[in-house]
Amino acid sequence: MDDIVNSVPSWMFTAIIAVCILFIIGIIFARLYRRASAEQAFVRTGLGGQKVVMSGGAIVMPIFHEIIPINMNTLKLEVSRSTIDSLITKDRMRVDVVVAFFVRVKPSVEGIATAAQTLGQRTLSPEDLRMLVEDKFVDALRATAAQMTMHELQDTRENFVQGVQNTVAEDLSKNGLELESVSLTNFNQTSKEHFNPNNAFDAEGLTKLTQETERRRRERNEVEQDVEVAVREKNRDALSRKLEIEQQEAFMTLEQEQQVKTRTAEQNARIAAFEAERRREAEQTRILAERQIQETEIDREQAVRSRKVEAEREVRIKEIEQQQVTEIANQTKSIAIAAKSEQQSQAEARANLALAEAVSAQQNVETTRQTAEADRAKQVALIAAAQDAETKAVELTVRAKAEKEAAEMQAAAIVELAEATRKKGLAEAEAQRALNDAINVLSDEQTSLKFKLALLQALPAVIEKSVEPMKSIDGIKIIQVDGLNRGGAAGDANTGNVGGGNLAEQALSAALSYRTQAPLIDSLLNEIGVSGGSLAALTSPLTSTTPVEEKAE
């Protein structure tokens, strides 16, 4: 070992010792050197005096030095005053507040030194720092609140905050602190139960609070009532508007339905009128065709009957003439001139009787023809009357429907229906009345025609009944005495005068004078232009070319 030490050069040994000493010194320096940071500074006291270190560092030797760390961060110190500790405002009201103070140590040698001297290590504990400076904050809050009313505090919070900040800033600077900002985080009126009525301030504030709350309650009640009234009025207006809209919708629906019904009724009326016109034309065509057929058939039958009657009459006349010639020849041969004259008179009587029978047959034919013509005229009149009445009824119905539709469109919805029903009934009644009037207008002529046709049809029976007394005559003797005013006196046929005419006519006229109920029968015959007093009067319509005048009604 000694050899090794002796073998090392002295300079090297010296160097090693120096390095060791430097290493030891570095370790000691590292252990004694304290650095400051941006968040924390410190104040060193002791050997060498007070030194504030904000950046960099310093040697702190135990026993010789002591350091006080200072927190350079911004600290939030929250102060709450409520219930019985609440603030009293200028108007003697109590308010609960929560105020946050944001403070920090002044970033200066003086500020840090002052903070270290007055606060020490409390800057590292916000709660300890708050407890230390809280009274300053409370004093500033009370002083500022006493200068403002509760409403001013609420309405101008920035003024309150600024007042607190100005009041407390100077006190904080004495501790090396600076106030960054003040925030009023909570503000509310203190409850009434925390007011002490035995305290003058609280009593005054309680009185004002009671007055204010009651006034506000009344105002709130008035507002609530006004709001309720306004809401009800709004609901009423809304309901009224809703009902009005529903009514308008209902009216529009009814109007639309009415228009649809009106259009439908108009279309149905046009269709009905068109169909009625078609039916009328078809019926008129059919009636015309049937009438032409009936007229043709009647004309044909009348022509056949006329030819037949004419032929029979000619044959009968020839037979009568032949018989007369034969009888005259036989009388000339068998009896004298006087007897021949008597037989001739008898032959003339029989000829006249045969002629009367022929005339009666002709009258029957004429009666049949007139009856057919009357029936045809009746049918034509009835068809024309029916057509006219139907046309008038259709026109009245269509016009009534049009008037009803126009009235329905102009009247109210419910009134329209009732009014339409009433007008429809009136229109139908008017149409029926018009039809009845038309029928009544034609009824007299039709009745008269039917009456005359009935008389014509019953004429044979009337004549038969009128000569009923002739059945009691057993026989008729004709005694002709010339020169006794034969045919000289023209008596009235209705009185039964037998004067004038041949023997047959005189005999028949005399027989007719024995008719029963002659006035009544003559009156009935006069209705159709026939006189029943004599054979000539009965056959005058057949032999006369003068038309029978219509009897004035």
Swiss-Prot record:
<feature type="transmembrane region" description="Helical">
    <location>
        <begin position="10"/>
        <end position="30"/>
    </location>
</feature>
<comment type="similarity">
    <text>Belongs to the band 7/mec-2 family. Flotillin subfamily.</text>
</comment>
<dbReference type="GO" id="GO:0005829">
    <property type="term" value="C:cytosol"/>
</dbReference>
<dbReference type="InterPro" id="IPR036013">
    <property type="entry name" value="Band_7/SPFH_dom_sf"/>
</dbReference>
<keyword id="KW-1133">Transmembrane helix</keyword>
<keyword id="KW-0812">Transmembrane</keyword>
<dbReference type="Pfam" id="PF01145">
    <property type="entry name" value="Band_7"/>
</dbReference>
<dbReference type="InterPro" id="IPR027705">
    <property type="entry name" value="Flotillin_fam"/>
</dbReference>
<dbReference type="InterPro" id="IPR031905">
    <property type="entry name" value="Flotillin_C"/>
</dbReference>
<keyword id="KW-1003">Cell membrane</keyword>
<keyword id="KW-0472">Membrane</keyword>
<dbReference type="InterPro" id="IPR001107">
    <property type="entry name" value="Band_7"/>
</dbReference>
<comment type="function">
    <text>Found in membrane microdomains that may be equivalent to eukaryotic membrane rafts. FMMs are highly dynamic and increase in number as cells age. Flotillins are thought to be important factors in membrane fluidity.</text>
</comment>
<comment type="subunit">
    <text>Homooligomerizes.</text>
</comment>
<protein>
    <recommendedName>
        <fullName>Flotillin family inner membrane protein YqiK</fullName>
    </recommendedName>
</protein>
<dbReference type="GO" id="GO:0045121">
    <property type="term" value="C:membrane raft"/>
</dbReference>
<dbReference type="Pfam" id="PF15975">
    <property type="entry name" value="Flot"/>
</dbReference>
<feature type="topological domain" description="Periplasmic">
    <location>
        <begin position="1"/>
        <end position="9"/>
    </location>
</feature>
<keyword id="KW-0997">Cell inner membrane</keyword>
<dbReference type="GO" id="GO:0005886">
    <property type="term" value="C:plasma membrane"/>
</dbReference>
<feature type="topological domain" description="Cytoplasmic">
    <location>
        <begin position="31"/>
        <end position="553"/>
    </location>
</feature>
